[in-house]
Structures are given as C-alpha cells and as structure tokens.
C-alpha cells in the first residue's frame, strides 16, 4: 500500500468562536495549510480537542476539511476511542464522508493487554477497510503498543503506519528492526524530537506547531532527504517549541492560530486559555520566529 504521506502532517486544531466550531475559520486554516506545504491533515485528534467535540461536530469538521482539501493531500480522521464498536461506527462515518485514512489511539482508562490491542485494532481495520495509523501516546493513555505488537499488527493489510509519541528511541530502533519500512510508515508524534526522528529514518511527523508553520517542518524533512545537517535549521523551531511548552497542548497553539486569524484562542473546558502574560510572551516568541524568516 505504501506510505500515506511523507514529511509534515498537521494535527489540526479546531477553531472556536463563542464556544462553537468556527467553520469559516476552519476553511481558511485548511487553505493556509495547503498553500504552505502540508502533506497531510489529521482531523479530530488530540490537538482538535476530540474529547469535547460531539459526534456531529466531528463529522461536520471532517466534511469541511475533505471538501476544502479536494484530494490534494490525504485527510486522516481521528476515530479511535476506548470502545471498539464506537470506534468502528465513527470510522465508518469517516469513510463515508471521504477520509483517506483513520487514526486509532490506544484504549485509555479501560486499559487492555497486548492481545486486546491486537484484537481491538484488527477488528476496526477489518470492519472499515481504510488505511490505519496506530497512535501510541502513553503519556495520555498510560498504555503502550509494544514493538512486537506493532509488528503483528503490520501483517494486517490496512494497518500501515504508527504515530509514535513515546519519545523513546530504543523503541524506534526496535520498530525499525521488525518492520518493512517501505510499506509501514513511522511518524513522530513529538515536535521537539524530529531532528533525531528524521535522522533515524522516520518518515515524517504529525505536528502541533505545524498548524502555523507547516512549511518550516516540510523544509526540514526535505533537507534531511537531501542528506543535509538539519540541526541548525531546527534551532529556531526549537526556540518556538520552548515557548509553546508553557501549557498543555492544544492550549498554546490555539493562541498562535488566533494570531493568524483562524478563530480565537478559545478552548473548551476542562481546558482553559493561557494567562494573558503567558499568551503575550508566546506571541512575542512567534513574532520573533517570523521576523527571522523561518516560517
């Protein structure tokens, strides 16, 4: 089947105005991403505030994104939950709306074991028959997909990629030894480790800060493919990432999408917006990044 994309996929933030999804801002944002070298758009994931979106909102957001993208890049829908049947239902709706692939997080709260993960993911994949990106983010789920389990899952024709947010490079090396990387893609789920991830053979990143600087990330990936040393090129991005670490994702990046006019910096409870002083510091860091010609 090959890789869904290579380079930068954007973990799309959801713009809100007065606590409602701002679909006009969403359309502008997606057009901006397409114009600035995004290679894939990932909808309704962690950065989208998935837990506080209704099923209807998720479907509407996906439909808008699919329509704006119009086949130019793959659209990946975050449809995974800790309920296998609900995940199937959401994934089938995503397929009908026009998603090119689905992303499935490991079950959370009602944690399972590795055999349960295999059964969960393969049941969804076989029911939906779309390319699947597994999402391993133990910091949020307290559950990990062992490398051996990923190897087993990769035997399923639909399970073709992993978003790896472990920040564990021993895990990455284990995966590389077990998988056919011509057919199975490894995407970083951590913006701040992409130099090492790219240097060690990763196929791309599903990025938060690429909501505002997709071209910078894609340029970094392209430079690595040309065997360039990308550490110095990454340094301005790292400085911006340090500023973004002021609070949990997606609170800070919403302040930056607001700067670009894609909604405002609203988030839904239980998330709360940045303190004014923190927001101002972050906006200053972003302005310095842009003044440096890095975007």
UniProtKB/Swiss-Prot annotation:
The record marks 46, 109 as: Part of a proton relay during catalysis. Its EC number is 4.3.3.7. The active site is at 135 (proton donor/acceptor), 163 (schiff-base intermediate with substrate). Pyruvate binds at residues 47, 206. It is found in: Cytoplasm. InterPro entries: Aldolase_TIM, DapA, DapA-like, Schiff_base-form_aldolases_AS. It catalyses: L-aspartate 4-semialdehyde + pyruvate = (2S,4S)-4-hydroxy-2,3,4,5-tetrahydrodipicolinate + H2O + H(+). Pathway: Amino-acid biosynthesis; L-lysine biosynthesis via DAP pathway; (S)-tetrahydrodipicolinate from L-aspartate: step 3/4. One of its GO terms (molecular function) is 4-hydroxy-tetrahydrodipicolinate synthase activity. GO terms for cellular component: cytosol. The keyword Amino-acid biosynthesis applies. SMART domains: DHDPS. HAMAP family: DapA (MF_00418). Homodimer. Belongs to the DapA family. This is 4-hydroxy-tetrahydrodipicolinate synthase. It comes from Staphylococcus saprophyticus subsp. saprophyticus (strain ATCC 15305 / DSM 20229 / NCIMB 8711 / NCTC 7292 / S-41). The gene is dapA.
């Amino acid at each position: 089947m090959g890789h869904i994309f290579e380079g930068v996929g954007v973990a799309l933030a959801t713009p809100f105005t007065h606590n409602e999804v701002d679909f006009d801002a969403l359309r502008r944002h997606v057009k901006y991403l397409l114009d600035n070298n995004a290679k894939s758009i990932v909808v309704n994931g962690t950065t989208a505030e998935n837990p506080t979106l209704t099923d209807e909102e998720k479907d509407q957001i996906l439909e808008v994104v699919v329509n704006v993208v119009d086949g130019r890049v793959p659209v990946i829908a975050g449809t995974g939950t800790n309920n296998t049947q609900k995940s199937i239902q959401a994934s089938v709706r995503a397929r009908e709306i026009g998603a090119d692939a689905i992303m499935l997080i490991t079950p959370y709260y009602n944690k399972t074991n590795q055999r349960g993960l295999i059964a969960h993911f393969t049941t969804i994949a076989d029911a939906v028959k779309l390319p699947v990106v597994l999402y391993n983010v133990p910091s949020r789920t307290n559950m990990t997909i062992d490398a051996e389990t990923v190897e087993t899952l990769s035997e399923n024709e639909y399970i073709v990629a992993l978003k790896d947010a472990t920040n564990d490079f021993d895990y990455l090396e284990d995966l590389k030894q077990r998988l056919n990387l011509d057919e199975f893609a490894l995407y970083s789920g951590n913006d701040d480790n992409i130099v090492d991830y790219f240097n060690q053979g990763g196929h791309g990143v599903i990025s938060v800060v690429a909501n505002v600087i997709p071209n910078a990330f894609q340029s970094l990936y392209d430079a690595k493919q040309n065997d360039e040393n990308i550490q110095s090129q990454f340094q301005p991005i790292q400085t911006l990432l340090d500023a973004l670490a002021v609070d949990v994702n997606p609170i800070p990046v919403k302040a930056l999408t607001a700067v670009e006019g894609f909604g405002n910096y609203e988030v839904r409870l239980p998330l709360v917006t940045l303190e004014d002083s923190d927001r101002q510091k972050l906006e200053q860091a972003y302005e310095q990044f842009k003044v440096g010609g890095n975007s």
